[in-house]
């Protein structure tokens, strides 16, 4: 209501072809949206009937405006581009891959595909209330610091981020649900996005006023969940008169990562977040009457030895608890009997322990609880709804991939490439069954089998095989696909052994310096683990530096080996390959594979490489995912990319039907260049030949990048290189020197190098 009243007082003006002269240059953007005289949005619209009018050309035009008339963008909130059919919007600093469609005109349902995307964006995003809401509550600035290792010059880059449609509607619905849950007599204004009931799931609309359960937001990993939490806190602090926010994670490294995201966005929060190192610090921070954004881990809510009730930290009701990954088992209420041991590790008795959810309620009895999760809540899970309530909003894999919020994940089994005995396979199956239980004695039994399996997986001969295969596989992918890789090892010992085996093959990849080297191990260790392991120990500050290096696509660090770290919450968009050599299942597996689903330039997808036979675990995870209401596959077989590559290869070959290019592969350099020019001339003679050829070769290149180093991809490598060379020639004279071609705008797929 307050937002609507503000809109009435504001003056909104849209101007067509407004002339701007700056530094002697005269430019006329298609549309400028002024609010009280400030140009908050600039729109570049291309003619749908013009075959050269593309989203990319509209984006290039906008880049030209930024260079030639920069003062127009001083107050800019949004840039909008459209080719007449599609329409996308983004912030001033967004690259082309981060320009996103706005899929709902009213926030209650996704718009029909028969309705123009531009019309939907104008109605949904550029209406007066939403535009001002985006300015006030859904815009953040993140600064990243990079240091040139040669010059030691530090560069600070500021990136402006604006909420995508799924974040905007989910957060506003969460605000309404929080108001209801705190006891204020005001319910949700109906589903502000596709209702969870469409997935066969219960939603918060059925919950009573004042139940202190704000609900759960399920947004698939990689779709901006952390930023959604920031937007929520920034707005709820204003809407509910500065409540205290307690953000809870279940691991210290996750706490640090999420805290870092919030700390970067303190302008929106209007306060500086703090971390509570222990229960006493937490109690001290909660002693104030209002305000504060406090970070802590769920493990801090552990009562003293012999106690099964956690002391109350505050009885205030203006406290909102936000839990990241709210589905995890530690939020349970269930009591368990656990053994008590003395210093000699002898059992001397037993005691009752509850799940952390009970202790959390003991500590903050009148708080309101909100959960965020990247994976669905299990159907049989009664703890999560008991603590947080039902779903507020669902944004699953299918929707995220369709929207371009994430990329597809492909799966490749390399089990046949490395030795794992029949004994080892049986041990993995047995271990999986026993680790699924939550009973302590069964977990202890599983530890013994884990030790056995670790010895088999970590045998010197097998480690050498895995290392050799990873080096070959990764180098072949790097030839055609710019990016980085992560190796997941079963134990610290195996992580170090793998590192040593890889370095034996590629000594030049090693460096003792933290800021140098192509490969690093990211882990902690204790002094009792021996010097070989301890030398790879990293402190929090060192891991932060390694994370910055890993996220920087230009840094020489290309591979990291981890055991548990960075498998949840770590966001490196240029990461494209995950090598798994560790038994994993369920939520942990889903979280791990999502490391490679981030959008980066024109990255066609991420690849999960399996050395242990986790296919059955992936199937279970998929079954659980779909049973829980999710749409879309968490992973797709690499064979699908190979099939698409073959299909696109055939299409490109058909375009060159009638032109014999086979002599190219046996010709010398001068004849090769001549054949490329002849092929270019042949393509230009076809009806819309250039456009069709460029589009099909782009599609072929993307499928080829995912398929490599499959043997079928390796067989056609030279042919793909030839087609890419023709495409490069066709595109070469497309743009003036001051403009980038479509292909030069953010590309991660490398042209296959012709060795001749």
Language-model-detected regions and their locations in the chain:
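Post-DEXD/H (motif II) to motif III coupling segment of the RecA-like Helicase ATP-binding lobe
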Residues: 332-410, 417-424
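Inter-Walker segment of RecA-like/P-loop motor cores
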Residues: 266-305
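Conserved C-terminal RecA-like helicase domain
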Residues: 449-562, 718, 725-740, 744, ...
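Interdomain helical connector at the RecA1-RecA2 junction of SF1/SF2 helicase-like NTPases
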Residues: 381-482, 499-503
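Accessory helical-bundle/CTD segments and flexible terminal tails appended to RecA-like ATPase motors
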Residues: 660-756
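ATP-dependent helicase/translocase motor core
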Residues: 1-5, 9-244, 253, 257-269, ...
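Conserved RecA-like ASCE ATPase "motif II neighborhood" in helicase/translocase motors
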Residues: 292-359, 541-547, 562-564
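Long, hydrophobic alpha-helical segments
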Residues: 600-700
């Amino acid at each position: 209501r307050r937002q609507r009243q503000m809109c009435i007082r504001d003056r909104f003006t849209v101007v067509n072809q407004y002339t701007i002269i700056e530094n002697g240059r005269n430019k006329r953007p298609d549309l400028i949206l002024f609010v009280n005289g400030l140009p908050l949005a600039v729109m570049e619209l291309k003619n749908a009937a013009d075959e050269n009018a593309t989203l990319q050309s509209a984006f290039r035009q906008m880049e030209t405006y930024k260079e030639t008339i920069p003062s127009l963008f001083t107050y800019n909130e949004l840039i909008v581009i459209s080719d007449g059919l599609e329409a996308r919007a983004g912030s001033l600093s967004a690259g082309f891959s981060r320009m996103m469609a706005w899929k709902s005109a009213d926030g209650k349902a996704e718009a029909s595909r028969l309705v123009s995307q531009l019309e939907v964006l104008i109605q949904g995003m550029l209406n007066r209330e939403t535009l001002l809401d985006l300015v006030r509550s859904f815009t953040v600035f993140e600064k990243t610091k990079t240091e040139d290792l040669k010059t030691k010059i530090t560069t600070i880059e500021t990136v402006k981020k604006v909420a995508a449609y799924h974040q905007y509607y989910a957060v506003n619905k969460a605000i309404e649900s929080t108001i209801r849950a705190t006891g204020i007599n005001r319910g949700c204004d109906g589903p502000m996005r596709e209702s969870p009931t469409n997935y066969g799931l219960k939603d918060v609309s059925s919950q009573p006023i004042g139940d202190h359960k704000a609900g759960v937001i399920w947004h698939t990993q990689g779709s901006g969940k952390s930023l959604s939490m920031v937007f929520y806190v920034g707005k709820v602090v204003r809407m509910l008169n500065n409540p205290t926010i307690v953000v809870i994670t279940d691991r210290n490294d996750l706490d640090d990562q999420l805290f870092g995201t919030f700390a970067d966005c303190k302008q929106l929060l209007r306060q500086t977040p703090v971390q509570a190192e222990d229960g006493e610090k937490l109690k001290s921070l909660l002693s104030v009457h209002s305000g504060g954004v406090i970070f802590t881990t769920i493990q801090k809510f552990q009562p003293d030895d012999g106690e099964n009730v956690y002391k109350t930290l505050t009885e205030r009701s203006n406290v909102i608890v936000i839990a990241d990954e709210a589905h995890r088992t530690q939020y349970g209420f269930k009591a368990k009997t656990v053994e008590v041991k003395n210093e000699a590790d002898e059992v001397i008795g037993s005691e009752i322990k509850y799940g952390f959810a009970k202790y959390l309620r003991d500590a903050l009895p009148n708080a309101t609880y909100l959960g965020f999760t990247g994976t669905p809540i299990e159907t049989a899970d009664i703890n999560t709804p008991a603590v947080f309530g039902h779903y507020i909003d669902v944004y699953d894999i299918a929707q995220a991939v369709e929207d371009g919020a994430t990329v597809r994940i492909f799966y490749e089994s390399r089990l046949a490439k490395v030795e794992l005995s029949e004994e080892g396979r049986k041990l993995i199956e047995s271990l999986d069954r026993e680790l699924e239980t939550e009973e302590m004695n069964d977990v202890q039994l599983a530890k013994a089998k884990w030790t056995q399996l670790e010895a088999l997986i970590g045998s010197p001969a097998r480690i050498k095989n895995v290392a050799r295969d990873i080096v070959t596989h990764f180098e072949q992918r790097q030839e055609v696909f710019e990016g980085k890789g992560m190796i997941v090892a079963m134990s610290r010992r195996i992580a170090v052994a793998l590192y040593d085996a890889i370095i034996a093959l590629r000594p030049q990849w090693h460096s003792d310096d933290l800021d140098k080297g192509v490969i690093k191990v990211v882990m902690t260790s204790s002094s009792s683990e021996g010097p070989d392991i301890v030398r790879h120990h990293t402190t929090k500050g060192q891991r932060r530096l390694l994370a910055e290096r890993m996220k920087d696509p230009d840094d020489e660090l290309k591979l990291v080996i981890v055991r548990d770290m960075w498998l949840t919450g770590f966001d490196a968009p240029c990461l494209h390959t995950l090598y798994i050599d560790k038994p994993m299942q369920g939520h942990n597996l889903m979280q791990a594979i999502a490391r490679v689903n981030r959008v980066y330039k024109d990255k066609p997808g991420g690849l999960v490489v399996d050395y242990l036979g986790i296919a059955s675990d992936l199937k279970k995870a998929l079954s659980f995912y779909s049973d829980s209401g999710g749409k879309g596959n968490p992973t797709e077989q690499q064979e699908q990319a190979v099939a698409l590559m073959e299909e696109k290869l055939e299409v490109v070959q058909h375009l060159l039907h009638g032109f014999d290019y086979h002599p190219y592969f046996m010709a010398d350099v001068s004849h090769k260049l001549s054949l490329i020019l002849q092929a270019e001339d042949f393509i230009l003679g076809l009806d819309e030949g250039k456009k069709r050829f460029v589009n099909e070769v782009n599609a072929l290149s993307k499928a080829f990048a995912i398929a490599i180093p499959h043997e079928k991809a390796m067989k056609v490598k030279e042919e793909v290189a030839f087609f890419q060379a023709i495409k490069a020639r066709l595109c070469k004279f497309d743009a003036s020197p001051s403009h980038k071609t479509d292909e030069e705008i953010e590309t991660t797929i490398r042209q296959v190098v012709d060795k001749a």
